[in-house]
Structure formats: structure tokens, C-alpha cells
């Protein structure tokens, strides 16, 4: 999802993607999605399953609501990628479940998985709450992610530098209310039982 930066009046806006399976992007550039809007025009990603994509699960710039999604078996390219740009972004990231998989590449090599959140900086403002991370022990028993999981330390010229998004204490008012908000565990169970195309019960 992307607009022409030369046409400010012609930007993607008020888009919701929900109850979808977004997976197995074509190799060798296996991506879940690129979501780029302006700071005033948003995309909501709600109750989706991102599965078996090496990177961009998704990659986000602009205004984004990422709630009650399950991410499984992303690779070494990134799970939720936070812009990596000087463009201002504002995200509401709540109650998602990040589950590490086997991370096998199409050529049989092991990729390994990145941290759930990557490529952040101070230009990316985010409210993070209720997100869980689970390893690959075969049991869904993840731990809740903390702000420290979205911070990176480096040393530049002998000085320690901490890079992080700008953490918000609550979601910005510009984001719409999600009335069917679930916990990460409830979202996982709902997606397993109901996700994807559902005719005629839901999508008729």
C-alpha cells in the first residue's frame, strides 16, 4: 500500500485489512507487505496471520494500527519493521503474538529470526502494549514484550547510544477504536478457528 508522494491529495487512507492470511511470499524476496502512508492517512491491520515471510511482516511508514495479529515463522529480514526513515510515523501496536518458527529458507538453509521489532528511530512514535513473543519449544507459552525489547544499544566514538522509537503512553486519538479488541492469546485462538476466507458464515 503506497501513494505517489508527488500527489498529496491522492494518498491511501482509511484502509482496513482484517481476518486475512498473508503468507509465503514468493522467493527469493519473500515479503509480507509494505504499508506506506502519510501521518494523517492510516491503515489498520487487524486479526491477520502473517506466516512464512522472510521480511516485512509488515514494514510500516505513516499512520498504522496493528492490533490482534499473529506473526509466525518470519525470517532474518524482519517481523514488524518500523519505518527506518526520517518520515514521521505513528503506530498503535497492541495485543499481537509473535511466534518463532523453524525459519527454513527455500534453499534449505536456516535463516534465524530477527527480534519482533526492528529498524526503529525517534521519528517513529509507537504505543506498545500486550504484545507477546514465543520461542520454538512447541508450546504456546510466550512472554510479554517490554520496551527494552524495542531498544538497541551501540557504541559510537566510545559513547553508548540507545536507539528506540518514541514511546507513547497511550494510543494517539487519531486511531479509531477497535471494539472487538482481544488479548494476544484470544487473538491467536480466534485466528486459528476463524481466520481466512469464511463463506458463507462471515464473508457472504
Listing of model-derived features with the role each one plays in the protein:
Residues 51-53, 76-80, 109-116:
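Short, flexible active-site loops
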Residues 57-59, 79-82:
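Short catalytic-loop micro-motif centered on adjacent basic/acidic residues
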Residues 6-7, 54, 59-61, 88, ...:
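Context-gated lysine
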Residues 1-56, 63-76, 90-102, 127-134:
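Right-handed parallel beta-helix
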Residues 94, 98-204:
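Long, contiguous C-terminal flanking segments immediately downstream of a protein's structured core
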